[in-house]
Amino acid sequence: MRSVVLVALAAAIGNMLQGWDNATIAGAVIYIKKEFHLEKEPKIEGLIVAMSLIGATLITTFSGPVSDKVGRRSMLILSSVLYFLSSIVMFWSPNVYVLLFARLLDGFGIGLAVTLVPIYISETAPSEIRGLLNTFPQFCGSGGMFLSYCLVFGMSLQESPSWRLMLGVLSIPSIAYFVLAAFFLPESPRWLVSKGRMDEARQVLQRLRGREDVSGELALLVEGLGVGKDTSIEEYVIGPDNEENEGGNELPRKDQIKLYGPEDGQSWMAKPVKGQSSLALASRQGSMLPRGGSLMDPLVTLFGSIHENLPSENMNASSRSMLFPNMGSILGMMGRQESQWDPERNNEDSSDQDENLNSPLLSPQTTEPDDYHQRTVGTMHRRQSSLFMANVGETATATSIGGGWQLAWKYNDKVGADGKRVNGGLQRMYIHEETANNNTNNIPFSRRGSLLSFHPEGDGHDQVNGYVQAAALVSQASMMPGGKGETAMLPKEVKDGPGWRELKEPGVKRALMVGVGLQILQQFAGINGVMYYTPQILEETGVSSLLTNLGISAESASLLISALTTLLMLPCILVSMRSLMLSTIPILILSLVTLVIGSLVNLGGSINALISTASVTVYLSCFVMGFGAIPNILCSEIFPTSVRGLCITICALTFWICDIIVTYTLPVMLKSIGIAGVFGIYAIVCAVAWVFVYLKVPETKGMPLEVISEFFSVGAKQQDAAASFLSDG
């Protein structure tokens, strides 16, 4: 995993440059005003700062769709070039107009980085550490601000500080970013899969994961190309298989699925549960309308049912999965068969290599029962992990996809009137196990090593003898089986790119509502307005009175305080993202209210300065820990691969438009209603944001991206269907 961490860190340098720019312009604008005599021109001052935001907004309009066509890596390289060019022009700027043009170029680079870096990291990171890696952009942004504030503070101590040098230093880290983007960063494997470039995607995954066999994850990326096609949630009870036929081969009973373990002789039976569901996932999906007048979105409850049943964080790696030990290795045995993933062996024609997914996951199983009897159980255990449905003819193979999830496929074969089997299509299954904490049947179990030791109870086959419960999202597969079942073909329509009509999908619309809502509330909570003008705000609140005895000017003192503030901006996504926002937003409200009170009540210069400085510091630190980092992370996770670039563009446009409004209007608002009025408005917005997060924002931590999209789709469709049924009734 070391490689994927380094890749995420290198990509996040683009955000470090954004933070660097935010800090330098905040310090440089103090001296820009003096040189160009803008003290009485707050609109021009605001335009100098906001011009980069205008550029970011303009470039964001095209960044998502263009990145879907040319790739994420190419756009990051372009971002580094724009950063460098803008810094050179800012260093040369002879007048305000050239400076405004340079700020526009700078905004182009910022817009590309801020929009695409979270997407890039989400598309390259494994689900188990995706949330942690996605803190890198915010961490690097805060680090860039800290370093830049320190640099600007040092320059401000000179007799004649040069704002051109402050802005021009950006060219140095821009060169480093270009080198890393051009020669170190790989292309996003999900983007490569969406273009049918399977062999390149496999090589990238091998590099990022540090192992040769990545066939399971590669198949997951293919399945992520199609979301929400008649998805249903099914419930299973899984227990020991003690049935044997006369030949020693274990056969499943009717309507049961056999799961083979990693060792010879290990097998389980998965029995579909009919009637009222006892599983949290399946039962909560049963009623998608709010109950008892509750305003909480049922999707929040549906996602929550997954995280309530995840093993505790302090479990060791071998016990994180009750049903699938070692993160799913009971079913994911194909990972040991590196030789099975061989384009030359599976497909003589190498020209079709990019079109086909030559994967053991769709194994060449025969569909006739007699062929199955000819196989020995031991060979089946060693070569693949399979699921068989008796008397129906369904076969499937499965692999672990992280986060306690398994991806499985089954051929939905039907028996025709002539007694022959007819291919009913390929279905995928995202399987998730329940933990002991939610064992509603009170069935005893014990843990032996990393495997479960089952204790059958009762007589007869009609009684539930299993001790592990699981739920599965079942829908039509994106892959299309090849001639003998050895090859999974990519859907032809994938290469045509996303269309606007896909935004009408219920799951995509619901995800857009969450993403756009978070971006609006985040910006109108005032974070960027506060950051851009932190030196001036602290100067106006009287912070210089605390440092006059040190011989430091008011401008330098405010820059020093800003540097110390950014040092505290250490984001933390080691816990639930939803819980982190719900915990930190009240602190934001409290700090803003304290700032308002400190501005209205005269307690003396030193006391007022301390209150204002402490309030701003707490606000910035808590904001970046929660509400500042999470919206971009969440937006990079909740959309399907086929429309991710387009949806991120919509969210990013919302981000930049709101950012422009906040940044451009702040100088005017400070003069008209003062600091107390401005931060009073921000406090009200934060209160609204807390309500929105509580009612509408689900928890996605640790879930594969494809599963997240599937949940949004199935939840939104079923809720819409239920609402339509009630309205018609």
Swiss-Prot record:
InterPro entries linked: MFS_dom, MFS_sugar_transport-like, MFS_trans_sf, Myo-inositol_Transporter, Sugar/inositol_transpt, Sugar_transporter_CS
Top-level lineage group: Eukaryota
Chain residue ranges for the region called Disordered: 337-372
GO cellular component: plant-type vacuole membrane
Membrane-protein topology: Multi-pass membrane protein
Localization per record: Vacuole membrane
GO molecular function, one term: transmembrane transporter activity
Keywords in alphabetical order: Membrane, Phosphoprotein, Sugar transport, Transmembrane, Transmembrane helix, Transport, Vacuole
Positions bearing Phosphoserine: S446
Main location: membrane
Compositional bias annotation for Polar residues: 356-367
Keyword set includes Protease: no
Reactions this protein catalyses: D-glucose(out) + H(+)(in) = D-glucose(in) + H(+)(out); sucrose(out) + H(+)(in) = sucrose(in) + H(+)(out)
Disruption outcome: In triple knockout plants missing MSSP1, MSSP2 and MSSP3, reduced accumulation of glucose and fructose during cold adaptation.
Name of one Pfam family that matches: Sugar_tr
Annotated family: Belongs to the major facilitator superfamily. Sugar transporter (TC 2.A.1.1) family.
UniProt name for this protein: Monosaccharide-sensing protein 3
Species of the source: Arabidopsis thaliana (Mouse-ear cress)
